[in-house]
Amino acid sequence: MNQYDLNLILNPNLSAEQLQIEKDYIETTLRNNGAEVTKLDDVGNRRMAYPIAKDREGYYLMYTIRAGGNPEKDIASTLRLRDNVRRVLVVKDRPEWKTKKA
């Protein structure tokens, strides 16, 4: 299993209850595709560089997951179908990117 960063931008106008429903759906989707969440950074509402669906802000969630197979195809394509999900980005986490070489 490899480690990936899963970054999501959600609709910024979600209530706390709707946000919890979206988080539960995301985690269920990850589990159903054989991924395990190792870390969740709930960044919250942030201003975006350009509007997405006429919104200047987005609610950011950044997951670190361990998954096998092709999470871009399996997980991201499923999450993109949700109405409240504005953007999905899956990036393979490589340890050599985190260490600075002199």
Swiss-Prot record:
Q: Where is the signal peptide?
A: none
Q: Which InterPro entries match?
A: Ribosomal_bS6 (IPR000529), Ribosomal_bS6_sf (IPR035980), Ribosomal_S6_plastid/chlpt (IPR020814), Transl_elong_EF1B/ribsomal_bS6 (IPR014717)
Q: Report if keyword Thylakoid is assigned.
A: no
Any GO BP? translation
Output one GO MF annotation: small ribosomal subunit rRNA binding
Q: Which GO terms describe its cellular component?
A: cytoplasm; ribonucleoprotein complex; ribosome
Is RNA-binding among this UniProt entry's keywords? yes
Q: Keywords on this record?
A: Ribonucleoprotein, Ribosomal protein, RNA-binding, rRNA-binding
Q: Which Pfam family, any one of them, does this sequence belong to?
A: Ribosomal_S6
Query: Which residues fall in a coiled-coil region?
Result: none
Q: Which PANTHER family match?
A: MITOCHONDRIAL 28S RIBOSOMAL PROTEIN S6, SMALL RIBOSOMAL SUBUNIT PROTEIN BS6M
Q: What does this protein do?
A: Binds together with bS18 to 16S ribosomal RNA.
Family under the similarity heading: Belongs to the bacterial ribosomal protein bS6 family.
Could you identify this protein by its name? Answer: Small ribosomal subunit protein bS6
Higher taxonomy: Bacteria, Thermotogati, Deinococcota, Deinococci, Deinococcales
